[in-house]
């Protein structure tokens, strides 16, 4: 029998998944923290929310929706009777009524293709298979699997002593939890937490059991020559800070570089997988990856772009020093970088002037293009950059090249306002509500009418009506020629080659 954790939680013993244990006196097993009353109250689902059904309705009454347990639906509207909703079934496409009691939040269950790249995620395997994978026993050896008994759920499996303990991951108000005391936005956050603090589980998570046959991003990077030597790296002053670590100035083999330091090993793995994508991208308008260093987390070594981010560049120079033609060139540079990403079917997710860097020769370069997705995994929707994020991404988490186009429209407004914050004097809530009702920003002072028209096309409510970046590049090229400036040639370079020793920075 598996050992009990020091706090009452939902446990499963060898081969069994979690069951709701009876309430036990905290004097027997240490402190017990029940979920707050508010967390146990039924949730009101807003239109557009994706939910999962908790039961089956195979014989619906007229007007009701037919569904099976584990089906995904999208809420269309709440009924006057607050215990019912009208929803659309993802599989059949049918619309109908279903009871609120049959629903739970499905946001955490949305398929994330990068989850399969996590070294500890084994997908759909049984509890018995998990036990076999976690042999020989080793305290803290772990994996995460999809539940066979509860479709859509996850199970954390941990080796401890001679046992493998299975913790069912519960869904509470759009978050994930094991003990109903500590909640997480996603599985990556949960795993990272338990590598630092064992909390309600039997032991800290120490070592992931890698899925057999899966090639790690680390192996791919090493084979291609992208792993750099820590001994050649000198770190300098901090020049920025992101959600998961600092950005530092540095030198590698005597050349200036920028270094993003991700300290947590589990978070570093997510960034490492994203970095593997970046090695295959080369374009004059993308900040160049030079390599990575694995040491107490992850160092991502990038080219140093001397004039800093575009927001500060514009704010510190203003109209007196930066002409309209230069603004158009910056916008075109960004659009060309994004057209390249779009052609590779990659989505940035955090396109904004703060993430555009300006080189010594005034070339604008898109940064964090391979890392935005890893960063967004650790953020809940309330912490997304609301003023730059497309409505469908805010509402339903639907990121695409078209949501990047929306963000590009906001970036255009930033550029032609010389670095002002968009939606001035409006709170995030006011912005979200106003945009949903059709509000769009007025043009900045001095902005050409044709550029504001382009912004408007980027802000179409229907994503399909927004132009692709290819069309945006064509439009900005015409604008530049109309003011007597030749548009630069395309910036694509050779792809997929890692830096050789002679190319080391």
UniProtKB/Swiss-Prot annotation:
Catalysed reaction(s) here are: L-tyrosyl-[protein] + ATP = O-phospho-L-tyrosyl-[protein] + ADP + H(+)
Q: Where is the SH2 domain?
A: 120-209
Q: How does it assemble?
A: Interacts with KIT.
| Catalytic residues of the enzyme | 350 (proton acceptor)
Q: Does the keyword Transferase apply?
A: yes
Please give the tissue specificity annotation from the record for this chain.
Most abundant in brain, and to a lesser extent in the spleen, the thymus and the liver. Also found in the T-cell lineage.
Any one GO molecular function term: non-membrane spanning protein tyrosine kinase activity
Segments forming domain Protein kinase: 233-481
SH3 domain boundaries? 46-108
Disulfide bond as a keyword of this entry, yes or no, is: no
**Cellular localisation:** Cytoplasm; Membrane
**Keyword terms, alphabetized:** ATP-binding, Cytoplasm, Kinase, Membrane, Nucleotide-binding, SH2 domain, SH3 domain, Transferase, Tyrosine-protein kinase
Mind telling me which residue stretches traverse the membrane in this protein?
Answer: none
- GO CC: one term? cytoplasm
Which protein are we looking at? Megakaryocyte-associated tyrosine-protein kinase
The role this protein plays is: Could play a significant role in the signal transduction of hematopoietic cells. May regulate tyrosine kinase activity of SRC-family members in brain by specifically phosphorylating their C-terminal regulatory tyrosine residue which acts as a negative regulatory site. It may play an inhibitory role in the control of T-cell proliferation.
Q: Which family does it belong to?
A: Belongs to the protein kinase superfamily. Tyr protein kinase family. CSK subfamily.
The UniProt record lists the EC number as 2.7.10.2
Looking up InterPro entries in the UniProt record yields: Csk-like_SH2 (IPR035027), Kinase-like_dom_sf (IPR011009), Non-receptor_tyrosine_kinases (IPR050198), Prot_kinase_dom (IPR000719), Protein_kinase_ATP_BS (IPR017441), Ser-Thr/Tyr_kinase_cat_dom (IPR001245), SH2 (IPR000980), SH2_dom_sf (IPR036860)
Q: Where is this region: Disordered?
A: 483-505
């Amino acid at each position: 029998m598996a050992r009990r954790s020091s706090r009452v939680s939902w446990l499963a013993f060898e081969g069994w998944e979690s069951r709701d244990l009876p309430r036990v006196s905290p004097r027997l097993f240490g402190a017990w923290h029940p979920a707050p009353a508010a967390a146990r109250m039924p949730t009101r689902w807003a239109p557009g929310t994706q939910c999962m059904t908790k039961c089956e309705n195979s014989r619906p009454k007229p007007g009701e929706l037919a569904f099976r347990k584990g089906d995904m639906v999208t809420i269309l509207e709440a009924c006057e009777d607050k215990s019912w909703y009208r929803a659309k079934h993802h599989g059949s496409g049918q619309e109908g009524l279903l009871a609120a009691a049959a629903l739970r939040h499905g946001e955490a269950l949305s398929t994330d293709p990068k989850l399969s790249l996590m070294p500890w995620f084994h997908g759909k395997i049984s509890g018995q298979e998990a036990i076999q994978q976690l042999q020989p026993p080793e305290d803290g050896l772990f994996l995460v699997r999809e539940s066979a008994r509860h479709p859509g759920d996850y199970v954390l499996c941990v080796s401890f002593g001679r046992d493998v303990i299975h913790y069912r991951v519960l869904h509470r108000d759009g978050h994930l939890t094991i003990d109903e005391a500590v909640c997480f936005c996603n599985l990556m956050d949960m795993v990272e937490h338990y590598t630092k603090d064992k909390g309600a589980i039997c032991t800290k998570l120490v070592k992931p059991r890698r899925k057999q046959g899966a090639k790690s991003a680390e192996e791919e990077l090493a084979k291609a020559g992208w792993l750099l030597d820590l001994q050649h790296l000198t770190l300098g002053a901090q020049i920025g800070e992101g959600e998961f670590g600092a950005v530092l100035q540095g030198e590698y083999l005597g050349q200036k570089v920028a270094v993003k330091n991700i300290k947590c090993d589990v978070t570093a793995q997510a960034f490492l997988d994203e970095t593997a994508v970046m090695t295959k991208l080369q374009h004059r308008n993308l900040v160049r990856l030079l390599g990575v260093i694995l040491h107490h987390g992850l160092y991502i070594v990038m080219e140093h772009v001397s004039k800093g981010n575009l927001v500060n560049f514009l704010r510190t120079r203003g109209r007196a020093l930066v002409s309209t033609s230069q603004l158009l060139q910056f916008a075109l540079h960004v659009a060309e970088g994004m057209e390249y990403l779009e052609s590779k079917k990659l989505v940035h997710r955090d396109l904004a002037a703060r993430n555009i860097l300006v080189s010594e020769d005034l070339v604008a370069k898109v940064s964090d293009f391979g890392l935005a997705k890893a960063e967004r995994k650790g953020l809940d929707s309330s912490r997304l950059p609301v003023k730059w994020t497309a409505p469908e991404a805010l509402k339903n988490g639907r990121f695409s090249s078209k949501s990047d186009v929306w963000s590009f429209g906001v970036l255009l407004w930033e550029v032609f306002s010389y670095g002002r914050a968009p939606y001035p004097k409006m709170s995030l809530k006011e912005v979200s509500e106003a945009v949903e009702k059709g509000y769009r920003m007025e043009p900045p002072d001095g902005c050409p009418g044709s550029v504001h028209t382009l912004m408007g096309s980027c802000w179409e409510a229907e994503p399909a009506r927004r132009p692709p970046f290819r069309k945006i590049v064509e439009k900005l090229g015409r604008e530049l020629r109309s003011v007597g400036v030749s548009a630069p040639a395309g910036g694509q370079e050779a792809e997929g080659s890692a830096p050789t020793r002679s190319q080391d920075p």
